[in-house]
């Protein structure tokens, strides 16, 4: 996990794949099971132009630019704007650690395979560098020129050393000598002291000192400690802030250290000092050997991660040319990987400012409602009794996760009639009540199976800890299938009811994480349907045993079923559209997801558009599809909704064939070829009506969003002067607890 919040947690990272001409190409030594052949297309791709795809890396940068647009929006609560500045920064860190690192590896290996839009790895790196410099500079300016002055108007100041009076400097001198100086280690560079290792994402001061005797100059590096606050608060605040709020004055800790460099280098003259920060390659893959303990292999690779090669160097834009040249040489960084920042580096630290107790400067508190099916009554029913009466669709965070999905697992753990609980865990919270319930169930003698995905990027250490805690409690812990990540969100409860064994299920789009469930928009299906129960039984058997199950009754399961299943449904939609006549306009596909990249799925949508099927895509992040282009995508629109909550659900609707699907898979190579993913059909008309309503709200012409044009540019919509509604606010008002 990077930063204090994974608001944009799934930033579409993963191994950089060769996209053309073989979208299923694998690297030498890759033991990932081969993906099945694609469904037979209704028409050949010869009818589609070569330039039909947008670049996925540049599309991701456009997504992060939309996050930045939220920070620049002065109609947003002020501390929420600071939060989005922090999110932008941590997003970009992760993008460089994984996506850019993967492209660099391919370039260095001489792999010349083109991306789907026809660019070599080197060409993509060049464009990424140019675009990153633009948006990183804008990011710094939004903070410096807009958010920072606005914070000052509210009595929240981020000051410089020059702004301080003598009393404040004396106060900070005491703090420095007591709290900071003991943990600083100045590292000189000379023939006896090689250039020190600089850890990834650490903030550092590059210092030049001069010897008074002979004028000789030397370089030294001082690491800014990460165990002290980035922003040091000055004491003695008053209440002269807006509406009587306390005044807060903060000094960046690197400024404090810089002010006391003479203490670190006594007897030396400080010539210059500049902040810098490097990002290292974190794009490693665990070599999975059937004869080796996966936990040990992963821990070995995690230890190596911190020593990855540098992929980005961030410097203050006033760094001297000589200092920059020294850093480039010693850190072995290409000049094209330098990002010059006009202001403070590493604004992910703004989470500290966001944490101030200033509710008037934040979004209004929202308390999720309990789903009506699970509402407390005079004689409360168990969730099992409720599900026997019919399926329930929960929409988080508008409906509470803790009183629905979490309670489902907790009731199962406490119910003496429950025989077994089986669940997948991809990312979970540090004090997870779900994991606690599984441990309680195992200690009570139930059969508990947890499929823990310990390879979930940047959450590996946390998942290893939970895996060991579960094992110690007697839970049967499995790590899935060699070569695949288990990303599906599924839970199965087996319960004895008299002479009958009944299975209860949950299939969702989001993680079993009670904290992110308050921040991420997701949907989940709770059901006692026998066919889904049988399907999940087969799925868990394949994950824990040697089953080679490839087909299911009511599920689509990757890596062998989702791509082909979706393309088949697109083609059935085309057939139904043509059967009723294009004039009837019956063909209509609506898709909501985090990312749309897979070329085979995109081509199927293009072919559907060419015969008149209307296609509406709501995509939060990457979109490689080019909508609205003459000749192949005139009938396709794509929009992106960003806001208070991370839009995370994956929902598919094929109107002519009357099918709704939800699940964990985005339309990306990694999800469809290298992960275990599950999509489930929602059949109950009561629930499909809820999904239809969700689409209607998201696709309302008045909904605030960004719309994608055929040129790859995202434009804010509706245009100024038009009526605007906020999709998420509308849903909050509808679900707000009394």
From Swiss-Prot:
GO terms for cellular component: polyphosphate kinase complex. It catalyses: [phosphate](n) + ATP = [phosphate](n+1) + ADP. Keywords: ATP-binding, Kinase, Magnesium, Metal-binding, Nucleotide-binding, Phosphoprotein, Transferase. Mg(2+) binds at residues 427, 457. Its cofactor is Mg(2+). Its EC number is 2.7.4.1. An intermediate of this reaction is the autophosphorylated ppk in which a phosphate is covalently linked to a histidine residue through a N-P bond. One of its GO terms (biological process) is polyphosphate biosynthetic process. GO terms for molecular function: ATP binding; metal ion binding; polyphosphate kinase activity. It holds the Pfam family PP_kinase_C_1. It is an enzyme of class 2 (transferase). Residues 19-30 have a biased composition (Basic and acidic residues). ATP binds at residues 91, 520, 620, 648. Catalyzes the reversible transfer of the terminal phosphate of ATP to form a long-chain polyphosphate (polyP). Belongs to the polyphosphate kinase 1 (PPK1) family. This is Polyphosphate kinase.
């Amino acid at each position: 996990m990077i930063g204090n919040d994974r608001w944009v947690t799934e930033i579409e990272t993963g191994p950089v794949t060769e996209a053309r001409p073989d979208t299923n190409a694998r690297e030498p030594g890759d033991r990932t099971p081969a993906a099945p052949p694609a469904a037979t297309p209704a028409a050949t791709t010869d009818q589609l132009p070569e330039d039909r795809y947008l670049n996925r890396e540049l599309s991701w940068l456009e997504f992060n630019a939309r996050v930045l647009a939220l920070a620049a929006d002065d109609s947003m609560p002020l501390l929420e704007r600071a939060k989005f500045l922090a999110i932008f920064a941590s997003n970009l860190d992760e993008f460089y650690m994984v996506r850019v690192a993967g492209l660099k590896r391919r370039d260095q290996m001489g792999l010349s395979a083109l991306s789907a839009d026809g660019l070599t790895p080197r060409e993509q790196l060049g464009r990424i560098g140019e675009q990153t410099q633009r948006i990183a500079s804008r990011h710094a300016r939004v903070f410096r020129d807009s958010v920072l002055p606005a914070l000052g108007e509210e009595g929240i100041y981020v000051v410089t050393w020059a702004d301080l009076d003598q009393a404040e400097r004396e106060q900070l001198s005491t703090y420095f000598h007591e709290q900071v100086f003991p943990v600083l280690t100045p590292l000189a560079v000379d023939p006896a002291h090689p250039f020190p290792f600089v850890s990834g994402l650490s903030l550092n001061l590059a210092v030049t000192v001069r010897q008074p005797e002979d004028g000789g100059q030397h370089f030294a590096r001082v690491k800014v400690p990460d165990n002290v606050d980035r922003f040091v608060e000055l004491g003695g605040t008053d209440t002269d802030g807006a509406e009587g709020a306390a005044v807060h004055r903060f000094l960046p800790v690197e400024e404090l250290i810089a002010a006391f460099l003479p203490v670190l280098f006594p007897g030396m003259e400080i010539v210059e000092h500049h902040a810098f920060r490097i990002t290292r390659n974190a794009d490693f893959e665990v070599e999975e050997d059937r004869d080796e303990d996966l936990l040990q292999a992963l821990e070995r690779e995690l230890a190596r991660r911190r020593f990855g090669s540098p992929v980005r160097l961030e410097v203050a834009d006033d760094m001297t040319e000589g200092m920059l040249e020294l850093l480039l040489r010693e850190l072995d960084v290409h000049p094209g990987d330098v990002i010059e920042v006009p202001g403070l580096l590493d604004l992910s630290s703004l989470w500290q400012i966001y944490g101030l107790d200033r509710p008037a400067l934040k979004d209004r508190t929202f308390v999720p409602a309990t789903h009506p099916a699970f509402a407390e009554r005079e004689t409360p029913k168990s969730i099992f009794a409720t599900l026997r009466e019919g399926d329930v669709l929960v929409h988080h965070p508008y409906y509470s996760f803790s009183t629905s999905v979490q309670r489902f697992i907790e009731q199962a753990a406490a119910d003496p009639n429950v025989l077994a609980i089986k669940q997948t865990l991809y990312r979970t919270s540090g004090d997870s009540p779900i994991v606690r319930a599984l441990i309680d169930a195992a200690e009570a003698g139930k059969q508990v199976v947890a499929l823990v995905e310990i390879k979930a990027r940047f959450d590996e250490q946390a998942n290893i800890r939970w895996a060991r805690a579960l094992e110690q409690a007697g839970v049967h812990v499995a790590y899935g299938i060699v070569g695949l990540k288990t990303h599906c969100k599924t839970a199965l409860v087996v319960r004895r009811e008299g002479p009958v064994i009944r299975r209860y299920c949950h299939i969702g789009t989001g993680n079993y994480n009670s904290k992110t469930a308050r921040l991420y928009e997701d949907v989940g299906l709770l059901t006692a349907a026998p066919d889904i129960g049988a399907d999940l039984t087969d799925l868990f058997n394949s994950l824990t045993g040697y089953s080679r199950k490839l087909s299911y009754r009511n599920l689509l399961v990757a890596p062998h079923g989702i791509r082909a299943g979706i393309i088949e449904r697109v083609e059935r939609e085309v057939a139904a559209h043509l059967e009723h006549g294009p004039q009837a306009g019956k063909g209509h596909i609506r898709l909501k997801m985090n990312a749309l990249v897979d070329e085979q799925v995109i081509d199927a949508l293009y072919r559907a558009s060419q015969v008149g099927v209307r296609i509406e895509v709501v995509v939060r992040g990457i979109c490689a599809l080019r909508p609205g282009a003459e000749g192949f995508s005139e009938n396709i629109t794509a929009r992106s909704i960003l806001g208070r909550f991370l839009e995370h659900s994956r929902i598919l609707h094929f109107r002519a064939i009357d099918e709704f699907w939800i699940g964990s898979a985005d339309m990306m190579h990694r999800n469809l070829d290298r992960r275990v993913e599950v999509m489930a059909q929602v059949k109950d008309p009561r629930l499909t009506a809820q999904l239809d309503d969700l689409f209607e709200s998201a696709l309302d012409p008045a909904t605030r969003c960004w719309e994608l044009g055929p040129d790859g540019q995202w434009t804010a919509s509706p245009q100024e002067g038009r009526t605007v509604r906020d999709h998420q606010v509308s849903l909050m008002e509808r679900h707000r607890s009394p």
